Amino acid sequence: MWYDKEKLCKELWCMKRFFKSLLTSFLIGIPVAVGLIIFMYMSQRNVSDEYIEIHIPEKTIAKEEIIVQEEFPKELEINDNQIVLEETFSDTVNAPVSLSFAGDVHFSEQYIAGYEKSGVSAFADDEMLGLMRNADLFMLNHEFVFSVRGEAMEDKEYTLRNDPEYVKILQEFGTDVVGIANNHVLDFGQEAFLDTLDTLEAAEIAYVGGGHNIEEASAPVVRTINGQTFAIFAATRVSPSYDWYAGKSRPGIFQTYDATALNKALSTAEQTYDHTIVFVHWGIERNEMPEEYQRTLAKGYIDAGADLVVGCHPHVLQGFEYYNGVPIVYSLGNYLFGNRTGETLLLNAEFSSDGDLKIQLIPCERINGVLTRIQEPKELFEKLTNLSFGVAISENGILVP
Protein backbone atom coordinates (compact mmCIF):
# COMPACT_ATOMS: atom_id res chain seq x y z
CA MET A 1 0.00 0.00 0.00
CA TRP A 2 1.39 3.39 -0.88
CA TYR A 3 1.38 6.11 1.75
CA ASP A 4 3.01 9.45 2.42
CA LYS A 5 5.73 8.79 5.00
CA GLU A 6 6.09 12.45 5.91
CA LYS A 7 2.36 12.85 6.50
CA LEU A 8 2.24 9.71 8.65
CA CYS A 9 5.04 11.01 10.87
CA LYS A 10 3.22 14.26 11.41
CA GLU A 11 0.04 12.41 12.41
CA LEU A 12 1.93 10.18 14.87
CA TRP A 13 3.61 13.24 16.41
CA CYS A 14 0.23 14.98 16.83
CA MET A 15 -1.30 11.92 18.51
CA LYS A 16 1.65 11.69 20.90
CA ARG A 17 1.24 15.36 21.83
CA PHE A 18 -2.52 14.89 22.34
CA PHE A 19 -2.13 11.95 24.75
CA LYS A 20 0.64 13.77 26.62
CA SER A 21 -1.63 16.80 27.09
CA LEU A 22 -4.50 14.58 28.18
CA LEU A 23 -2.32 12.84 30.79
CA THR A 24 -1.03 16.18 32.08
CA SER A 25 -4.57 17.58 32.40
CA PHE A 26 -5.72 14.47 34.24
CA LEU A 27 -2.82 14.64 36.72
CA ILE A 28 -3.39 18.34 37.35
CA GLY A 29 -7.21 18.09 37.40
CA ILE A 30 -7.42 15.57 40.25
CA PRO A 31 -5.94 17.87 42.95
CA VAL A 32 -7.89 20.84 41.56
CA ALA A 33 -11.18 18.92 41.80
CA VAL A 34 -10.34 17.69 45.30
CA GLY A 35 -9.47 21.22 46.37
CA LEU A 36 -12.73 22.56 44.94
CA ILE A 37 -14.77 19.94 46.83
CA ILE A 38 -12.97 20.78 50.09
CA PHE A 39 -13.54 24.51 49.49
CA MET A 40 -17.29 24.00 48.90
CA TYR A 41 -17.60 21.83 52.01
CA MET A 42 -15.86 24.40 54.21
CA SER A 43 -17.99 27.20 52.73
CA GLN A 44 -21.15 25.29 53.55
CA ARG A 45 -19.96 24.81 57.14
CA ASN A 46 -19.34 28.53 57.40
CA VAL A 47 -22.82 29.31 56.06
CA SER A 48 -24.44 26.94 58.55
CA ASP A 49 -22.41 28.38 61.44
CA GLU A 50 -23.35 31.90 60.36
CA TYR A 51 -27.03 30.91 60.17
CA ILE A 52 -26.99 29.65 63.73
CA GLU A 53 -25.11 32.68 65.00
CA ILE A 54 -27.39 35.24 63.38
CA HIS A 55 -30.82 33.66 63.59
CA ILE A 56 -30.78 32.09 67.03
CA PRO A 57 -29.79 34.87 69.43
CA GLU A 58 -29.74 34.09 73.14
CA LYS A 59 -32.72 36.38 73.80
CA THR A 60 -35.01 34.02 71.92
CA ILE A 61 -34.23 31.03 74.12
CA ALA A 62 -37.12 30.52 76.51
CA LYS A 63 -37.51 28.04 79.35
CA GLU A 64 -40.01 25.33 80.16
CA GLU A 65 -41.47 24.25 76.80
CA ILE A 66 -39.76 22.35 73.98
CA ILE A 67 -40.73 22.89 70.35
CA VAL A 68 -39.03 20.88 67.58
CA GLN A 69 -38.89 22.67 64.24
CA GLU A 70 -38.25 21.07 60.87
CA GLU A 71 -36.67 24.27 59.55
CA PHE A 72 -33.48 23.88 61.61
CA PRO A 73 -30.28 22.60 59.90
CA LYS A 74 -29.62 18.92 60.58
CA GLU A 75 -26.50 19.67 62.60
CA LEU A 76 -28.47 21.75 65.12
CA GLU A 77 -29.75 19.75 68.08
CA ILE A 78 -32.53 20.96 70.36
CA ASN A 79 -31.94 19.90 73.92
CA ASP A 80 -33.51 21.18 77.13
CA ASN A 81 -34.69 24.62 76.05
CA GLN A 82 -37.27 25.89 73.60
CA ILE A 83 -35.71 27.72 70.67
CA VAL A 84 -37.98 30.25 69.01
CA LEU A 85 -37.18 31.97 65.75
CA GLU A 86 -38.80 35.39 65.50
CA GLU A 87 -39.30 34.91 61.77
CA THR A 88 -41.25 31.71 62.39
CA PHE A 89 -43.44 32.47 65.40
CA SER A 90 -45.83 35.39 65.91
CA ASP A 91 -45.72 34.96 69.68
CA THR A 92 -42.51 36.20 71.28
CA VAL A 93 -42.10 35.61 74.98
CA ASN A 94 -41.33 38.83 76.92
CA ALA A 95 -42.61 41.10 74.12
CA PRO A 96 -45.40 43.55 75.04
CA VAL A 97 -48.99 42.70 74.14
CA SER A 98 -51.23 45.18 72.33
CA LEU A 99 -55.01 44.84 72.75
CA SER A 100 -57.22 47.28 70.82
CA PHE A 101 -60.85 48.02 71.63
CA ALA A 102 -63.53 49.82 69.61
CA GLY A 103 -67.03 50.92 70.55
CA ASP A 104 -70.44 50.37 68.99
CA VAL A 105 -70.58 48.85 65.50
CA HIS A 106 -73.49 48.33 63.10
CA PHE A 107 -73.35 48.37 59.30
CA SER A 108 -76.02 50.72 57.96
CA GLU A 109 -77.40 50.47 54.42
CA GLN A 110 -75.15 53.38 53.46
CA TYR A 111 -72.09 51.52 54.71
CA ILE A 112 -73.10 48.35 52.89
CA ALA A 113 -73.60 50.27 49.64
CA GLY A 114 -70.17 51.83 50.06
CA TYR A 115 -68.64 48.43 50.74
CA GLU A 116 -70.14 46.95 47.58
CA LYS A 117 -68.59 49.78 45.61
CA SER A 118 -65.22 50.34 47.32
CA GLY A 119 -64.62 47.39 49.62
CA VAL A 120 -63.49 47.78 53.20
CA SER A 121 -61.94 51.17 52.43
CA ALA A 122 -65.50 52.52 52.55
CA PHE A 123 -65.30 52.12 56.34
CA ALA A 124 -61.79 53.22 57.30
CA ASP A 125 -58.62 54.53 55.72
CA ASP A 126 -55.42 52.52 55.45
CA GLU A 127 -53.94 53.86 58.69
CA MET A 128 -56.97 52.92 60.79
CA LEU A 129 -57.27 49.52 59.11
CA GLY A 130 -53.60 48.93 59.86
CA LEU A 131 -54.07 49.77 63.53
CA MET A 132 -56.97 47.32 63.82
CA ARG A 133 -55.24 44.53 61.92
CA ASN A 134 -51.84 44.87 63.56
CA ALA A 135 -53.04 44.69 67.16
CA ASP A 136 -52.35 41.39 68.91
CA LEU A 137 -56.09 41.30 69.61
CA PHE A 138 -58.83 43.57 68.25
CA MET A 139 -62.27 43.63 69.92
CA LEU A 140 -65.44 45.64 69.24
CA ASN A 141 -69.05 45.91 70.40
CA HIS A 142 -71.17 43.87 67.96
CA GLU A 143 -74.48 45.71 68.30
CA PHE A 144 -76.65 43.99 65.70
CA VAL A 145 -77.85 40.61 64.44
CA PHE A 146 -76.36 38.50 61.64
CA SER A 147 -79.48 36.84 60.20
CA VAL A 148 -82.26 37.00 57.63
CA ARG A 149 -84.73 35.27 59.94
CA GLY A 150 -86.98 36.40 62.75
CA GLU A 151 -89.39 39.24 63.41
CA ALA A 152 -88.37 42.62 64.77
CA MET A 153 -89.15 43.13 68.45
CA GLU A 154 -92.39 45.03 68.91
CA ASP A 155 -92.38 48.51 70.41
CA LYS A 156 -88.62 48.85 69.93
CA GLU A 157 -87.61 52.02 68.10
CA TYR A 158 -84.42 50.66 66.54
CA THR A 159 -83.86 47.04 65.52
CA LEU A 160 -80.54 46.28 63.87
CA ARG A 161 -79.41 43.42 61.66
CA ASN A 162 -77.21 42.56 58.67
CA ASP A 163 -77.07 39.70 56.22
CA PRO A 164 -74.62 37.03 57.46
CA GLU A 165 -72.54 37.37 54.28
CA TYR A 166 -71.22 40.69 55.63
CA VAL A 167 -69.35 39.00 58.44
CA LYS A 168 -66.51 39.25 55.93
CA ILE A 169 -66.30 42.95 56.82
CA LEU A 170 -65.40 42.08 60.40
CA GLN A 171 -62.83 39.63 59.07
CA GLU A 172 -61.31 42.31 56.85
CA PHE A 173 -61.06 44.59 59.90
CA GLY A 174 -58.95 41.92 61.57
CA THR A 175 -61.55 41.38 64.30
CA ASP A 176 -60.60 38.71 66.84
CA VAL A 177 -63.34 39.07 69.49
CA VAL A 178 -66.76 40.71 69.63
CA GLY A 179 -68.83 41.58 72.67
CA ILE A 180 -72.47 40.57 72.20
CA ALA A 181 -73.84 41.47 75.64
CA ASN A 182 -75.94 44.45 74.55
CA ASN A 183 -79.47 45.67 73.86
CA HIS A 184 -79.64 44.81 70.14
CA VAL A 185 -78.28 41.30 69.70
CA LEU A 186 -81.75 39.76 70.25
CA ASP A 187 -83.70 42.37 68.27
CA PHE A 188 -85.08 39.63 65.99
CA GLY A 189 -85.57 36.84 68.50
CA GLN A 190 -83.69 33.72 69.47
CA GLU A 191 -83.51 32.18 65.99
CA ALA A 192 -81.71 35.24 64.65
CA PHE A 193 -79.53 35.33 67.76
CA LEU A 194 -78.46 31.73 67.18
CA ASP A 195 -77.78 32.57 63.52
CA THR A 196 -75.46 35.29 64.79
CA LEU A 197 -73.54 32.85 66.96
CA ASP A 198 -73.23 30.39 64.07
CA THR A 199 -72.09 33.11 61.67
CA LEU A 200 -69.39 34.38 64.00
CA GLU A 201 -68.21 30.88 64.79
CA ALA A 202 -67.95 29.97 61.10
CA ALA A 203 -65.93 33.16 60.54
CA GLU A 204 -63.61 32.18 63.40
CA ILE A 205 -64.46 35.33 65.35
CA ALA A 206 -64.85 34.70 69.07
CA TYR A 207 -67.91 36.08 70.85
CA VAL A 208 -68.29 36.81 74.55
CA GLY A 209 -71.15 37.90 76.79
CA GLY A 210 -73.77 35.70 75.15
CA GLY A 211 -74.32 32.10 74.18
CA HIS A 212 -76.52 29.05 73.97
CA ASN A 213 -76.92 29.00 77.76
CA ILE A 214 -75.76 30.85 80.86
CA GLU A 215 -72.63 28.72 81.17
CA GLU A 216 -71.42 29.85 77.75
CA ALA A 217 -72.70 33.42 78.09
CA SER A 218 -70.86 34.02 81.35
CA ALA A 219 -67.59 32.40 80.28
CA PRO A 220 -64.62 34.56 79.27
CA VAL A 221 -62.72 34.45 76.03
CA VAL A 222 -59.23 33.30 76.95
CA ARG A 223 -56.11 34.07 74.93
CA THR A 224 -52.39 33.48 75.47
CA ILE A 225 -50.30 36.09 73.68
CA ASN A 226 -46.53 36.48 73.96
CA GLY A 227 -46.50 34.35 77.08
CA GLN A 228 -49.23 36.33 78.88
CA THR A 229 -52.73 34.99 79.55
CA PHE A 230 -55.88 37.10 79.21
CA ALA A 231 -59.48 36.43 80.26
CA ILE A 232 -62.03 38.80 78.69
CA PHE A 233 -65.57 38.95 80.08
CA ALA A 234 -68.56 40.82 78.64
CA ALA A 235 -71.85 41.69 80.33
CA THR A 236 -74.71 44.19 79.99
CA ARG A 237 -76.51 46.55 82.36
CA VAL A 238 -78.91 47.50 79.53
CA SER A 239 -81.55 45.03 78.31
CA PRO A 240 -85.09 45.47 76.93
CA SER A 241 -86.44 42.32 78.55
CA TYR A 242 -85.71 39.72 81.19
CA ASP A 243 -86.27 37.12 78.46
CA TRP A 244 -82.99 38.19 76.87
CA TYR A 245 -80.96 36.81 79.78
CA ALA A 246 -79.27 33.48 79.20
CA GLY A 247 -80.54 30.65 81.38
CA LYS A 248 -79.64 27.08 82.13
CA SER A 249 -81.06 25.96 78.79
CA ARG A 250 -82.04 29.32 77.28
CA PRO A 251 -79.87 31.20 74.76
CA GLY A 252 -79.21 34.80 75.65
CA ILE A 253 -76.84 37.35 77.15
CA PHE A 254 -74.95 37.76 80.43
CA GLN A 255 -76.42 40.51 82.63
CA THR A 256 -74.74 42.62 85.29
CA TYR A 257 -77.72 44.39 86.89
CA ASP A 258 -76.73 42.15 89.76
CA ALA A 259 -72.95 41.91 89.54
CA THR A 260 -72.61 38.95 91.91
CA ALA A 261 -72.07 36.31 89.21
CA LEU A 262 -69.62 38.43 87.23
CA ASN A 263 -67.63 39.42 90.30
CA LYS A 264 -67.39 35.79 91.38
CA ALA A 265 -66.14 34.82 87.92
CA LEU A 266 -63.58 37.64 88.04
CA SER A 267 -62.28 36.48 91.41
CA THR A 268 -61.79 32.97 90.03
CA ALA A 269 -60.16 34.20 86.82
CA GLU A 270 -57.75 36.44 88.71
CA GLN A 271 -56.17 33.38 90.28
CA THR A 272 -55.84 31.57 86.94
CA TYR A 273 -54.88 34.19 84.34
CA ASP A 274 -52.37 37.02 84.22
CA HIS A 275 -54.94 39.65 83.24
CA THR A 276 -58.74 39.91 83.45
CA ILE A 277 -60.74 42.43 81.42
CA VAL A 278 -64.41 43.48 81.59
CA PHE A 279 -66.17 44.75 78.46
CA VAL A 280 -69.46 46.18 79.74
CA HIS A 281 -72.60 47.68 78.18
CA TRP A 282 -74.01 50.39 80.46
CA GLY A 283 -74.95 54.04 80.94
CA ILE A 284 -77.48 56.40 79.39
CA GLU A 285 -77.49 57.11 75.67
CA ARG A 286 -75.96 60.47 74.66
CA ASN A 287 -74.92 61.32 78.23
CA GLU A 288 -71.27 62.35 78.33
CA MET A 289 -70.97 61.76 82.08
CA PRO A 290 -71.24 58.25 83.54
CA GLU A 291 -74.03 57.38 85.92
CA GLU A 292 -73.09 56.82 89.53
CA TYR A 293 -73.98 53.15 89.18
CA GLN A 294 -71.34 52.81 86.42
CA ARG A 295 -68.64 54.04 88.78
CA THR A 296 -69.88 51.72 91.52
CA LEU A 297 -69.99 48.67 89.25
CA ALA A 298 -66.54 49.40 87.82
CA LYS A 299 -64.94 49.63 91.25
CA GLY A 300 -66.66 46.39 92.24
CA TYR A 301 -65.22 44.65 89.17
CA ILE A 302 -61.76 45.89 90.09
CA ASP A 303 -62.11 44.81 93.71
CA ALA A 304 -63.05 41.38 92.36
CA GLY A 305 -59.93 41.18 90.20
CA ALA A 306 -60.39 43.13 86.94
CA ASP A 307 -57.26 44.73 85.45
CA LEU A 308 -59.14 46.86 82.90
CA VAL A 309 -62.78 47.95 82.50
CA VAL A 310 -64.01 49.12 79.07
CA GLY A 311 -67.54 50.47 78.55
CA CYS A 312 -69.91 50.95 75.62
CA HIS A 313 -73.56 51.91 74.90
CA PRO A 314 -73.99 55.69 75.39
CA HIS A 315 -73.07 56.30 71.69
CA VAL A 316 -70.85 59.19 72.83
CA LEU A 317 -67.43 59.33 74.44
CA GLN A 318 -67.23 59.48 78.21
CA GLY A 319 -64.22 60.08 80.44
CA PHE A 320 -61.75 57.94 82.35
CA GLU A 321 -60.90 57.07 85.92
CA TYR A 322 -58.29 55.05 87.80
CA TYR A 323 -59.26 53.04 90.84
CA ASN A 324 -56.53 51.28 92.81
CA GLY A 325 -54.26 51.77 89.82
CA VAL A 326 -56.68 50.12 87.36
CA PRO A 327 -58.05 52.12 84.38
CA ILE A 328 -61.79 52.52 83.75
CA VAL A 329 -62.93 53.59 80.27
CA TYR A 330 -66.56 54.63 80.72
CA SER A 331 -67.60 54.77 77.05
CA LEU A 332 -65.86 54.41 73.69
CA GLY A 333 -68.87 55.85 71.87
CA ASN A 334 -69.85 54.90 68.33
CA TYR A 335 -67.06 53.43 66.25
CA LEU A 336 -68.94 52.59 63.05
CA PHE A 337 -72.61 53.00 63.77
CA GLY A 338 -74.81 54.23 60.95
CA ASN A 339 -74.50 57.94 60.31
CA ARG A 340 -74.11 58.77 63.98
CA THR A 341 -70.36 58.35 64.28
CA GLY A 342 -68.75 61.63 65.32
CA GLU A 343 -65.47 61.88 67.17
CA THR A 344 -64.51 58.49 68.50
CA LEU A 345 -61.57 56.44 69.76
CA LEU A 346 -59.66 53.29 69.12
CA LEU A 347 -58.33 52.29 72.53
CA ASN A 348 -54.93 50.60 72.71
CA ALA A 349 -54.04 48.73 75.90
CA GLU A 350 -50.39 47.68 75.96
CA PHE A 351 -49.30 45.15 78.58
CA SER A 352 -45.54 45.01 79.14
CA SER A 353 -43.79 41.73 79.89
CA ASP A 354 -43.80 42.57 83.61
CA GLY A 355 -47.54 43.27 83.61
CA ASP A 356 -47.55 47.08 83.52
CA LEU A 357 -50.46 48.54 81.55
CA LYS A 358 -50.30 51.63 79.33
CA ILE A 359 -53.48 53.06 77.81
CA GLN A 360 -53.25 55.08 74.60
CA LEU A 361 -56.14 56.80 72.85
CA ILE A 362 -56.21 56.83 69.04
CA PRO A 363 -58.68 59.64 68.20
CA CYS A 364 -60.57 59.36 64.93
CA GLU A 365 -63.54 60.78 63.03
CA ARG A 366 -65.46 60.21 59.81
CA ILE A 367 -64.30 62.26 56.85
CA ASN A 368 -66.51 61.78 53.79
CA GLY A 369 -67.89 58.73 55.57
CA VAL A 370 -64.47 57.13 56.13
CA LEU A 371 -62.97 56.63 59.60
CA THR A 372 -59.75 58.66 59.74
CA ARG A 373 -57.27 59.45 62.50
CA ILE A 374 -57.53 62.96 63.93
CA GLN A 375 -54.19 64.68 63.36
CA GLU A 376 -54.77 67.56 65.81
CA PRO A 377 -56.54 65.96 68.80
CA LYS A 378 -55.66 68.59 71.43
CA GLU A 379 -59.21 69.96 71.68
CA LEU A 380 -60.73 66.48 71.99
CA PHE A 381 -58.19 65.45 74.64
CA GLU A 382 -58.96 68.58 76.65
CA LYS A 383 -62.67 67.79 76.50
CA LEU A 384 -62.12 64.19 77.62
CA THR A 385 -59.84 65.35 80.44
CA ASN A 386 -62.66 67.57 81.72
CA LEU A 387 -65.04 64.58 81.59
CA SER A 388 -62.61 62.38 83.53
CA PHE A 389 -61.93 61.86 87.23
CA GLY A 390 -58.38 62.87 88.12
CA VAL A 391 -56.92 61.65 84.83
CA ALA A 392 -54.79 63.63 82.40
CA ILE A 393 -54.15 62.84 78.73
CA SER A 394 -50.74 63.47 77.18
CA GLU A 395 -50.39 65.04 73.75
CA ASN A 396 -49.87 61.59 72.22
CA GLY A 397 -52.97 60.17 73.90
CA ILE A 398 -51.44 58.37 76.89
CA LEU A 399 -53.64 58.27 80.00
CA VAL A 400 -51.86 59.68 83.05
CA PRO A 401 -53.47 58.84 86.42
Segment roles from a protein language model:
Residues 15-20:
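Positively charged n-region of N-terminal signal peptides that target proteins for export
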Residues 25-401:
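Acidic, metal/ion-coordinating pockets
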Residues 1-14:
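Short, Lys/Arg-enriched N-terminal segments with co-localized hydrophobic residues
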